[in-house]
């Protein structure tokens, strides 16, 4: 579904070649969503998860300066509307003295476009990543995921170092075991040689016997 602006009279639709972003109604924040609905000034209009307002209806200070100003601030409310929905016939038939004075006109579209164009240059990203944010927390989620990946990479590196240390310790123990085997083998050979040698008896082991002539 191609995104389009829900503001009355606005013909903007999503086009990757135009520096116009679209922002979903904050349905999860009822109070802020009511402010958006009131700003749109459309009777019997109930936004859905597919409803959005384009960036031309927000003043430049509504955007965050990071990420090429494609994200709205948390409490941003659209205020720039050149067209409003026509009133009922009953209201149109009021006497001239009863009619309210017209509201002040907002700045021309060209001026707003120029301001947005200066503050919001087109975002140069790959085609598969050029879709505008569906909500205001996409970049925050991406940053959190990158931070988590970095933490996992650090943990993997620590485990690799521990594994390397354990392997070195194991090799040292194997060398020590080989040395002990050599010592035991040498001791056995020495014991075998001792068993085949002469036995020296003490001097008092023999008794001198006198034989008569």
Swiss-Prot record:
Result of changing residue 170 to R: In DYT6; no effect on dimerization
A Gene Ontology cellular-component term: PML body
Effect of residue 52 to A: Does not affect DNA-binding
Effect noted on mutating residue 46 to A: Does not affect DNA-binding
Consequence of changing residue 169 to Q: In DYT6; no effect on dimerization
Recorded consequence of changing residue 150 to P: In DYT6; no effect on dimerization
InterPro entries for this protein: THAP1/10, THAP_Znf, THAP_Znf_sf
Effect of residue 37 to A: Partially affects DNA-binding
Coiled coil: 139-190
Tissues with expression: Highly expressed in heart, skeletal muscle, kidney and liver. Weaker expression in brain and placenta.
Consequence recorded when altering residue 40 to A: Partially affects DNA-binding
Zinc finger (THAP-type) residue numbers: 1-81
Effect the entry attributes to changing residue 55 to A: Does not affect DNA-binding
Keyword Flavoprotein in annotation: no
Substitution effect: residue 35 to A: Does not affect DNA-binding
Outcome following mutation: residue 174 to G: In DYT6; no effect on dimerization
Subcellular location: Nucleus, Nucleoplasm; Nucleus, PML body
GO MF annotations in UniProt: DNA-binding transcription factor activity; DNA-binding transcription factor activity, RNA polymerase II-specific; DNA-binding transcription repressor activity, RNA polymerase II-specific; identical protein binding; protein homodimerization activity; RNA polymerase II cis-regulatory region sequence-specific DNA binding; sequence-specific DNA binding; zinc ion binding
Pfam families, A to Z: THAP
UniProt similarity note: Belongs to the THAP1 family.
Role according to the record: DNA-binding transcription regulator that regulates endothelial cell proliferation and G1/S cell-cycle progression. Specifically binds the 5'-[AT]NTNN[GT]GGCA[AGT]-3' core DNA sequence and acts by modulating expression of pRB-E2F cell-cycle target genes, including RRM1. Component of a THAP1/THAP3-HCFC1-OGT complex that is required for the regulation of the transcriptional activity of RRM1. May also have pro-apoptotic activity by potentiating both serum-withdrawal and TNF-induced apoptosis.
Disease implicated: Dystonia 6, torsion: A primary torsion dystonia. Dystonia is defined by the presence of sustained involuntary muscle contractions, often leading to abnormal postures. Dystonia type 6 is characterized by onset in early adulthood, cranial or cervical involvement in about half of the cases, and frequent progression to involve multiple body regions.
Protein name, as recorded: THAP domain-containing protein 1
Source organism of the structure: Homo sapiens (Human)
